[in-house]
């Protein structure tokens, strides 16, 4: 099956974070592709990737970048597909620089931005976007939400036992 989600990152060093999005996509059975596409080192590749994504069957792009973090915004400027930006943590500023770069897009070029390093939510957001068109993903999201509820209930149950037993 053709990939529905494109996961791109500016450098292989971003993979440490971006693989979390891929894990989510695999969990939900979403066909995807993963590539290193640098806005600064390979601008032609970035341009080609964004311009051909729709015709290749891609419906959502998840783009992770650190530092100046131009990849998500530049990708969004070249396609009308939804682009989800993942700010990658950096050594000097902890990823705040990446966050500001991705979230401060000019009017007309939206990038949905998740928390610094939170590619898990980027993957989940991509699945939610796809669930509008694909009912099987909506069903899996409902099941995922139920599992989260069960997990919280179990945590609360364990907490109550600990409190009752005198911390």
Curated annotation (Swiss-Prot):
The keyword Isomerase applies. It comes from the Bacteria. It catalyses: 5-carboxyamino-1-(5-phospho-D-ribosyl)imidazole + H(+) = 5-amino-1-(5-phospho-D-ribosyl)imidazole-4-carboxylate. InterPro entries: PurE_ClassI (IPR033747), PurE_dom (IPR000031), PurE_prokaryotes (IPR024694). Keywords: Isomerase, Purine biosynthesis. Substrate binds at residues 11, 14, 41. The keyword Isomerase applies. Catalyzes the conversion of N5-carboxyaminoimidazole ribonucleotide (N5-CAIR) to 4-carboxy-5-aminoimidazole ribonucleotide (CAIR). This is N5-carboxyaminoimidazole ribonucleotide mutase. The gene is purE.
């Amino acid at each position: 099956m053709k990939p529905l989600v494109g996961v791109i990152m500016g450098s292989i060093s971003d993979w440490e974070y971006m693989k979390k999005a891929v894990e989510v996509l695999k969990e939900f059975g979403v066909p995807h592709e993963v590539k290193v596409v640098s806005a600064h080192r390979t601008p032609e590749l970035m341009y080609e990737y964004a311009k051909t994504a729709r015709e290749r069957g891609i419906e959502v792009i998840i783009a992770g970048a650190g530092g100046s973090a131009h990849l998500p915004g530049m990708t969004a400027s070249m396609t009308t597909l939804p682009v989800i930006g993942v700010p990658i943590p950096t050594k000097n500023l902890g990823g705040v620089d990446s966050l500001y770069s991705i979230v401060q897009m000019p009017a007309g070029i939206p990038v949905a931005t998740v928390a610094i390093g939170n590619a898990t939510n980027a993957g989940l957001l991509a699945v939610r976007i796809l669930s509008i068109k694909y009912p099987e993903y909506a069903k899996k999201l409902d099941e995922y939400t139920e599992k989260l509820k069960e997990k919280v209930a179990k945590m609360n149950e364990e907490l109550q036992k600990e409190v009752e037993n005198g911390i």
